[in-house]
Amino acid sequence: MKAKRSHQAVIMSTSLRVSPSIHGYHFDTASRKKAVGNIFENTDQESLERLFRNSGDKKAEERAKIIFAIDQDVEEKTRALMALKKRTKDKLFQFLKLRKYSIKVH
């Protein structure tokens, strides 16, 4: 029974590979979409907020406002988003520390 399971695992792992060379296809980079500077250029603020909110972001509204701020250049937006991420991370660490100490007290 074990051998059968391992055989199934081997078949499953090879069928789940995403490499085009297994199937005889090659990547054609000429037909790929070109990269854009602003990936949010064709979206509005509400749909971006909804996207962030649905992905579990607690600060979806603030993050969308930062992205759609007209008066900021790219570097300022990047710094603002990184600061928002750091604040969220710091709050998480504060929460975990408080939780750790509250467990020791009880």
From Swiss-Prot:
Subunit note: Monomer. Interacts with NOTCH2 (via ANK repeats), the interaction inhibits the nuclear translocation of NOTCH2 N2ICD. Interacts (C-terminus) with CBY1 (C-terminus), TCIM competes with CTNNB1 for the interaction with CBY1.
GO-annotated cellular components: cytoplasm; cytosol; nuclear speck; nucleolus; nucleoplasm; nucleus; plasma membrane
Pfam families: TC1
Protein task: Seems to be involved in the regulation of cell growth an differentiation, may play different and opposite roles depending on the tissue or cell type. May enhance the WNT-CTNNB1 pathway by relieving antagonistic activity of CBY1. Enhances the proliferation of follicular dendritic cells. Plays a role in the mitogen-activated MAPK2/3 signaling pathway, positively regulates G1-to-S-phase transition of the cell cycle. In endothelial cells, enhances key inflammatory mediators and inflammatory response through the modulation of NF-kappaB transcriptional regulatory activity.
Top-level taxonomy: Eukaryota, Metazoa, Chordata, Craniata, Vertebrata
Subcellular location: Cytoplasm; Nucleus, Nucleolus; Nucleus speckle; Nucleus
Stated consequence of mutating residue 86 to Q: Abolishes interaction with CBY1. Forms irregular perinuclear cytoplasmic aggregates
Signal sequence annotation: none
Record has Oxidoreductase as a keyword: no
Designated name of the protein: Transcriptional and immune response regulator
Predominant cellular place of this UniProt entry's protein: cytoplasm
Tissue: Ubiquitous. Expressed in thyroid papillary carcinoma. Expressed in liver, expression levels decrease in hepatocellular carcinoma. Slightly detected in normal lung, its expression is highly induced in lung cancer cells (at protein level).
GO BP annotation list: apoptotic process; cellular response to heat; endothelial cell activation involved in immune response; negative regulation of apoptotic process; negative regulation of Notch signaling pathway; positive regulation of non-canonical NF-kappaB signal transduction; positive regulation of protein kinase A signaling; positive regulation of protein kinase C activity
GO function terms (MF aspect): Notch binding
Source organism of this protein record: Homo sapiens (Human)
Induction: Induced by pro-inflammatory cytokines such as TNF and IL1B, via NF-kappaB signaling. Induced by cellular stresses such as heat shock, TPA, lipopolysaccharide and UV. Induced by mitogens such as thrombin.
Keywords: Apoptosis, Cytoplasm, Nucleus
